Amino acid sequence: MSFLLGFVFLMLSCAQSGQRVEQSEQTDQNKAEQEKMRRSMLFGLIADSRIETLSAFAVANDYSDLFGKDSGPILLFAPTNEAFEKVDSVTLRSWRDQKNGMMKRLIGNHIIKVDQLSDDLSIYLDKNLTALNGSTLKIIQEQQAYYLEDVKGNRALIGPNPLRMDNGDIYYLDEVLY
């Protein structure tokens, strides 16, 4: 009888120990996932008050997985809130209509998947870069300033000090390219 009681006690101890290890592993995994998310472009996009307008549009148009889970590397050329304020209200209203898909295409026009990230935009100079939506963009330099240029010749000034995240870099634009 005491042997049986000892055996039951041993089994219960092992089961509880196994549960604690499993809970600890889940907690460690959750912490790792949370840390990875904090270093993702999605976190940077949502946390940065300079690009709240773009952030809202990106989340509403299903770009969360790209910015949160894709390993990249990705360049996001993010029009600032001020850039969106320059767009006339009729155009902005048509972009907000998710049924026409215009905002999804517009955001895709500002995203480029690259082979490598660099602290220096000069490695991308005068190369045809293909945006996520299939359009062709170029980074050009005039004096000390860099610009993003589309095939129509529209340009946006690329601001200094990009936000560098694990899966890509967020550069700030003074214009929306459309």
Located regions from the model:
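Sec-dependent bacterial lipoprotein signal peptides
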Residues: 1-12
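Mature, structured domains of secreted/extracytosolic soluble proteins
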Residues: 14-178
